[in-house]
Amino acid sequence: MLSAKHIELVKSTIPLLESAGTDITEYFYQRMFKHNPELKHIFNMSNQRSGGQPAALFSAIAAYAKNIENLAALSGAVERIAHKHTSLNIQPEHYPIVGHHLLATLRELAPEAFTTEVEEAWAAAYGLLAGIFINREDELYQKNANQLGGWLGARQFKVIEKRQESSLVTSFVFAPIDGESVVDYQAGQYLGIKVEPANHEYREMRQYSLSDKPNGKTYRISVKREDSRTPGNEPGTVSNYLHDQVNIGDVLDVFPPAGDFHYVERNEPVVLISAGVGVTPMQSMLEMLASKALDKPVFYLHACENLAQHSFNERVQALTNELKLTHHTWYRDLDGNEQEALNSQGQSNSGSVNSHMGFMNLVPLKAELPLDKGDFYLCGPVAFMSFVKQQLIELGVEDTRIHYEVFGPHSDL
């Protein structure tokens, strides 16, 4: 435990942290990668260039300083980060490296404020937090290793199927080359993969949501080709590599499933809300629900640009007949042929299919949705999820029943 003096000194640096902002974490990453370039093989360098990861790390550091006396308030963040770390195969020996560069960053950027006493306090605080992460990650590693089909670290998998789901999304099905079983996962979790693109200076590690129900034999991920997130930004390194270079028969390193966002079994209605490639964890949940033939209402709400970009559309149409499923889709831009195709979609036997134009508006569905008792799962762009969450709150949904996943560095809604 930290001493009262250490806590006081750490809290005294909060104004310094807030005034410096992401300058601290940007400097930290530059320093660390300069002195320990081998870590570029672990960190997502695209998130470094976009500024997403420095911003996320700054938020985490500031939150830790503010809650240094109430670490229970950080339990959700610790769980989320620990899962991400296991998908990257982070080991205890990595923590002293990060701690060294964090302390050096604070010392070099604020030499007058970051006295020897303050540095000792932050060293103790970092050591405490590192211990929390190391212990939790060890629990997750051992849990994966001890389950049927489980393993530690990287395991080689072969691509046995590659299928286009839409104009932007392609699915990849992996089977282990050792022919043994694979550990089950919870619907909504993701898979860590490592690739080595030709003529690329470092390996790349990514996490992609699993998009099918567990079967003990294979894994499926569905990846959106990131041509360019916004004008002026670079195309996605790994997504384009997977789409263009990885084919059936190729072998990749895969890490066990992880992630704190997943379906939780309850006897309440389920509402799955997604936009774009955020549909992938929802598809996993939907497939799992269908396999269990649960007798409860399921709502599937999805937003995308047009029919060409609507991943899993035909599969969801089929599942509508198997579940008590109500299916709503919002499109932004349909051509004449797509509009005609939508018009031909009728009522299913056990659920309903509905299409809308424009942004997702839940107000007209107020009487239809289980606002008082349903479990709501969200995934998609942060702006979309913030927009939807605000609607749900205004419609009376309790915040504790809204669960969401952010692709990339975490952001609060």
Language-model features and meaning:
Residues M1-A154:
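Globin-like tetrapyrrole-binding proteins
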Residues A72, V298-L413:
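Reductase modules of NAD(P)H-dependent flavoproteins
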Residues Q147-D250, C304-N306, Q317, W330-L334:
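Ferredoxin-reductase
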Residues G188, G278, P381:
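Short, conserved phosphate/pyrophosphate- and ester-handling motifs at nucleotide-, phospho-/glycolipid
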Residues H243, F255-N267:
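A short, basic/flexible loop-to-alpha-helix module at the beginning of a structural domain
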Residues P269-M288:
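A phosphate-binding catalytic loop at a beta-strand-loop-alpha-helix junction
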Residues M288-P297:
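Conserved S-adenosyl-L-methionine
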